[in-house]
A protein has these predicted regions:
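Sequence termini and other peripheral, non-core segments
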Residues: 1-10, 22, 26-29, 115-118, ...
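A structural feature that tracks compact, well-ordered secondary-structure segments
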Residues: 31-33, 37-63, 70, 105-142, ...
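Hydrophobic core of alpha-helical transmembrane segments in multi-pass integral membrane proteins
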Residues: 19-29, 94-105
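Alpha-helical transmembrane segments and their helix-start/interface "positive-inside/aromatic belt" motifs
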Residues: 3-21, 82-96
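Membrane-helix interface/capping segments
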Residues: 66-79
Length: 149
């Protein structure tokens, strides 16, 4: 008698993004109670941006495409409309650019010397890094690395 293969649970299928989200919530809670003028408080502010960037990267590369980037999954072959194909093939870059622009607007309207203004500035930096990594991996190679083709 063959054993029926069970599909993985929701927690198992999403354990990476859930773990990253839990780390981010933990850092947000600690930062909200810390003194941003101390080394430790400043560290937590930077860590929020870094871990948010990792979480966004994991989730965005799961749902969006970027043709030629080692950081993106491959689109299904059944998309035939040119505009739709362009939007789909570059949806990862488009999504990161649009959400990054929203972070920039928020940053420009915030007090950069405030506790959360510094965090938003770090998030803008992390967003630029993620977008840069997606674009760079379209054209640059690293032997032995998935990201470099």
């Amino acid at each position: 008698m063959r054993k029926r293969k069970q599909s993985p649970s929701f927690l198992r299928e999403h354990s990476l993004s859930l773990t990253l989200a839990a780390i981010l919530v933990f850092l947000l809670l600690i930062y909200s109670r810390s003194d941003p003028s101390t080394h430790l408080g400043s560290f937590f502010g930077n860590a929020i941006a870094d871990w948010l960037g990792v979480l966004v990267f994991v989730i965005a590369s799961k749902y969006f495409f970027e043709i030629g980037s080692g950081e993106s999954r491959k689109p299904a072959r059944h998309f035939h409309v040119r505009v739709a194909r362009l939007l789909i093939n570059h949806s990862l870059t488009i999504a990161l650019a649009l959400t990054g622009a929203a972070w920039v607007v928020l940053y420009l309207r915030s007090d950069v010397s405030s506790r959360w203004g510094q965090v938003v500035g770090n998030i803008v930096s992390a967003w630029a890094q993620v977008l840069g990594l997606v674009i760079i991996t379209k054209y640059a190679w690293e032997i032995g690395s998935k990201e470099g083709h």
